[in-house]
Amino acid sequence: PGSDRYSRAADDLGKWMNEGVLTQDEKPAIYYYTQTYTEKDGSKHTRKGFIGLSRLVDFGKGIHPHERTLSGPKADRLQLMQACDANMSCIFTLYSDPALRVNKLLEGAIAGKAPDIDVTDDDGIVNKIWRVDDKQTLSGVIESMSDKSLFIADGHHRYETALNYRNMMREKAGNFTGEEPFNFIMMYFSNMDDEGMTIWPTHRVVHSLKSFDADSFLASCKEYFDLKEFA
């Protein structure tokens, strides 16, 4: 066993692969992933998307961020990536496809097939995944996504870390083709135009601000927001 959490993570990953807990599919594939969840009003929604590889590009060249990042989390994720030589979780991206072409292609490919994974998590969300590996569907999805802009919904630190890792590996390799694994990253792609896509608020707690007056701040907020006191 390693002496720190990064080497221990690499040891665990290697053990899972050796024991067959994690296996590599024989054929190239993408993975259609749906999540069915219930809102507080009782309404049910199903978010649809797929997991696949995306080529790493600098921001503004087809992939766009919406938040700034911190150096600490990026350093942590880089150490994990260097130790494991793997993507440990998907970057969550949104794309626009009002015609739902990609979803229709994937739903056609899985019609009548049981999911490869069907599990309800601790939050009551029903997660289902189907492996899609027929060449016609894969080609259709790739073609449909070729001109799409991607917007990172979650994973800014991991994406920037992957860019840094790619650059380090390119410098180390000297010569590279651009098709090496380090030029790509695992992503979850979801259509922002699908009815299953909903946006919930994110609650942040801010503390230790100097000269902060809550009453004055709330009074200023009333000019731009509708405020509701909960506690």
Where are the predicted features?
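Surface-exposed, charge/polar-rich loops and edge strands
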Residues: 1-231
